[in-house]
Amino acid sequence: MASLPDTNKLLRNFSRCRNWEERYLYMIELGAKLPPLTDEQRQPENLIAGCQSQVWILLRMNHQNKVEFIGDSDAAIVKGLVAIVFILFQGKTTQEILDLDVTEYFGKLSLEQHLTPSRTQGLHAMIHAIRNRTSKMV
């Protein structure tokens, strides 16, 4: 995966932003760190249902039994949300992903209070899809 900050650095960087315009710019910057997917990876089975923008997420198990993520979106802010979701789940086992309470992190980032309803719905769709796909890897 791209060089993304860990959750603590994400929270710290978010808190340093003076307003939500800066936070959106930071989210776009995070999304830009995700490498683009190939045409072969942009297949319907990798699309996330429930997102207004097109979002593709792929999962694979590495040799340390940790789940690795690659993903993309056709919208810059949504791609930043994909990166944030990956930051929360990176380096975790399937069970840790299934057990993680993401609402705590989203609360600390104040994400849901500042996203449009359709982006919030898409964010939840990403989490649901990742957990669903992760449960099939167990």
UniProtKB/Swiss-Prot annotation:
Active site per database record: C51 (cysteine persulfide intermediate)
Entry's Gene Ontology cellular component terms: cytoplasm
UniProt xrefs under InterPro entries: Cysteine_desulfuration_SufE, Fe-S_metab-assoc_dom
Predominant subcellular localization, coarse grouping: cytoplasm
Superkingdom to which the source organism belongs: Bacteria
Recorded metabolic or biological pathway in which this protein acts: Cofactor biosynthesis; iron-sulfur cluster biosynthesis
GO BP annotation list: iron-sulfur cluster assembly; sulfur compound metabolic process
Keywords: Cytoplasm
Pfam families: SufE
Disulfide partners: none
Annotated localization: Cytoplasm
Family indicated by similarity: Belongs to the SufE family.
Subunit structure: Homodimer. Interacts with SufS.
Function: Participates in cysteine desulfuration mediated by SufS. Cysteine desulfuration mobilizes sulfur from L-cysteine to yield L-alanine and constitutes an essential step in sulfur metabolism for biosynthesis of a variety of sulfur-containing biomolecules. Functions as a sulfur acceptor for SufS, by mediating the direct transfer of the sulfur atom from the S-sulfanylcysteine of SufS, an intermediate product of cysteine desulfuration process.
Protein name stated in the entry: Cysteine desulfuration protein SufE
Organism: Photorhabdus laumondii subsp. laumondii (strain DSM 15139 / CIP 105565 / TT01) (Photorhabdus luminescens subsp. laumondii)
Gene coding for it: sufE
